Each structure stands twice: as C-alpha cells, then as structure tokens.
Amino acid sequence: MIIDAHVHLWKAQTGRREVDGMDRPVRSLTDGLSDFGGEIRQMMPPYMLTGENSPEMLIANMNYAGVNGAVIMGETMDGRQDEYFLAAKRKYPDRLKICAFFDDHEPYTLEGFDGIKICACKLKDPDLLKLFPVFKAARDAGKFVAIELLDGAAQTEELREIAKELPDLMIAIGHFGMVTRPDWQEQIRLARLPNVYVESGGITWLFNEEFYPYPSAVRAIREAAELCGMHKLMWGSDYPRTMVEITYKMSFDFIIKSSELTDEEKRLFLFENARCFYGFDNLPKLPVIPNML
C-alpha cells in the first residue's frame, strides 16, 4: 500500500502571491493554466480543462497509480478551500485526510478536519512563537499540524521550542525541508524529536532539473534517514503541480525502483510511517489493471 502525504485540491484558485512586496491574485484559468500573480503558468496538466482540481480526478489518478490514501492540504496561492476539502472527505472518507488552512491570522476552524496546514514560509511575520495558540489548539483538538518553513534554519529553533512544549502534538514538516536549499538538514534534524516527522511533497519539483529517476533525491532521502531515521520520513507528491512534468506514478516510482533503499525502507517511506502519523485505518486494496499497451 501507498499513502501520499502532500496533495492539493481546489474548486477554483482564489489565493495570492507576493510580488515586489505586494500581494497579487492567483486565479485559475482553463487548460490547466493559472494567472500566477500577473504571470501565466501551467499550474496543472492541460487535460484538467476547467481550472478545477477535483477530488474525483485525484482519486482516479490514485486508483490508476495504486495510491491508497492521501492527505489534502491548502496553500497560500490556492486560497482557502475548506468547504471543498470537507466535501471531498465526505465523499471519500476512507481515502482522504484533510487539513484546515491557517492563513496569516485570519479566522479558521478545526471542526471536521484531521489537521491544520500552516504555510510558515509565507507569513507576514515569520515568528512562529506568536502562533503558539494555533499549535496548542490543534493539540487540544487532537489534530496534527502540517507546516512548511522558511529555507534552512530560519524558523527551526522556534518550531523546536513549540514541539518540545507540546510533545503530544504531531507535526509534519513539508517539502522535505526544502532539500535543495542551504542548511536543509536543520529542518530534518527536528525530526529527531519524537513528535516531528518530515514529508517529501515537492521533492521532484526541487530536483526537477536533474529529472527522473532523481538520483540526487534518493541520496537526499538516504542522508535524511541517517539524520533522523527512516521511520520519520514520509512520501508526498505535491499533486497536481508536479504533474506538469511527470506522471503521478513517476512521483514515487523512482523510489520503488531505487537500489539504494531496502524494501523495508521503501515500505516505511511510502506507507507505514504515514499510516501511523495520520491514522489511516480503513484503506481499500486496489486492483491492478494492466495498461492497453
């Protein structure tokens, strides 16, 4: 079985992007395109025609690739999609875990969600300690926190302090600590704490110049495992943005085919760690359907 720890959905993008110190709107167009703060970008594959990034399309991709479960999270550029996530969870309760979205001190709710996503790298005020009440509320409600940090060690000591103060709060650091940036290992070292894990959403984006089968990404996973243990690392795809370059299956196939990881390490990374962290307990077995080739 496989669990994807980092997936995005949206009805229509209503978010923002900072350009020259000013917030510019991000809006869905057609044919997988988006207006990315004044620039037209291929945000998703062109066959996603309407601008909607739907749970039905995600589940179809998961079924085809053999991915049993996924964790849905928001992003500043996508805007708040809470109601859309809740509807997706109602439709696919055994396949999806969903995150509420914390957006720079705007009102938020945890009700109905499994966790909360904090884009700490995009906060106007990067001081994480000022968000301690948000972390504590998640702990008190039995929710996890998914967080993306500024590059390197810019916010690691603050997160370390919070994680130690709230040892019962489960925290997942995204984007594999921004693995291609200087001092990325400082974020990985946080996973030495018992309640902190790391997920690899976006790792194929970060190593896109090298491209499939991403040998440097595999070496980075190996290095991270030496820093915190393979039992603290989880796979994530960053669907659908990474799918403009590769197929969904390719986003984990390079792990399965790697000779640098053992079968047990692959099982932990692709499934078992995320099953334990997110609490997936009723995932369906998926049939293997051959391609028409």
PLM feature spans:
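Glycine-rich phosphate-binding "P-loop"
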Residues: 39-48, 72-73, 115-125
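Catalytic pocket-lining loop regions of alpha/beta-barrel enzymes
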Residues: 123-234, 276, 282-293
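Generic structural signal for well-ordered alpha-helices
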Residues: 58-59, 82-89, 106-110, 135, ...
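Mid-to-C-terminal alpha-helical segments outside catalytic/metal-binding sites
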Residues: 1-5, 12-60, 64, 69, ...
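Conserved, mostly hydrophobic/aromatic
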Residues: 6, 62, 85, 138, ...
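A metal-dependent hydrolase metal-coordination microenvironment
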Residues: 46-106
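Active-site beta-loop-alpha junctions enriched in small/polar residues
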Residues: 8-10, 75-76, 101-105, 119-121, ...
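Hydrophobic faces of well-ordered beta-strands that scaffold small-molecule active sites
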Residues: 3-7, 70-72, 98-100, 114-118, ...
